[in-house]
């Protein structure tokens, strides 16, 4: 039987730490959370490799190196409320739940929502929930959010989601600029002013369902 604990630590040592991730709580959450539980079948055998793994319904488990870079960029803290957009089977939601006071994962696909909910229960995570809804609208019921993570590349930044940031809030999203350029972008809000900066460049699979969403302009 595979030693997932050792594989998990190797992922942290070989993919996360060399990428200059220094957020101690994040490093601990990555080392403790059973990533293999969020995929099925033979995918468990390479879930700790540095690749994006298909979950079904055009959703992917983002590779640990990129995922950790996005979450570190958010600077999550224990008082924060987090939104995980395109949560898939709930891995990102589970990680955010260990870094924040509360985490909400939103997903359009009912089967994935069911899997995410079951896994959060199985892992005894009581400060997180997976809900079903259109991704482009975020989840206004629990807004505003201190941190928002988008688990997939978007062609542009969706206005409805950005507007759900709290004062001082941060949003991490990979923007597909075209011609192979993918920018991991941090968006910040201070009162009614918004800013953005590029964290790093890395390709991730696209998150469908945003083509008709109103676009946020800075």
Regions found by a protein language model. Give the residues of each.
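Conserved nucleotide-cofactor-binding alpha/beta core module
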Residues: 75-195
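Class I SAM-dependent transferase core
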Residues: 1-83, 91-95, 99, 112-122, ...
């Amino acid at each position: 039987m595979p030693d997932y604990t050792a594989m998990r630590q190797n992922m942290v040592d070989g993919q996360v730490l060399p990428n200059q991730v220094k957020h101690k709580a994040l490093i601990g959450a990555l080392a403790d959370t059973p990533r293999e539980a969020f995929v099925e079948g033979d995918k468990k055998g390479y879930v700790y490799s540095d690749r994006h793994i298909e979950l079904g319904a055009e959703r992917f488990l983002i590779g640990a190196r990129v995922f950790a870079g996005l979450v570190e960029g958010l600077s999550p803290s224990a008082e924060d409320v987090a939104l995980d957009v395109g949560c898939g089977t709930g891995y990102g939601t589970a990680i955010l739940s260990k870094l924040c006071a509360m985490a909400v994962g939103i997903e359009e696909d009912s089967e994935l929502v069911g899997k995410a909910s079951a896994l959060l229960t199985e892992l005894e995570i009581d400060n997180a929930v997976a809900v079903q809804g259109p991704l482009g609208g975020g989840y206004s019921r629990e807004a505003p959010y201190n941190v928002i993570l988008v688990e997939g590349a978007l062609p542009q930044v969706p206005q409805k989601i950005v507007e759900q940031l709290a004062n001082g809030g941060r949003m991490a999203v990979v923007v597909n600029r075209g011609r192979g350029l993918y920018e991991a972008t941090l968006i910040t809000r201070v009162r009614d002013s918004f800013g953005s900066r590029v964290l790093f460049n890395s390709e991730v699979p696209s998150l469908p369902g945003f083509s008709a969403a109103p676009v946020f302009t800075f």
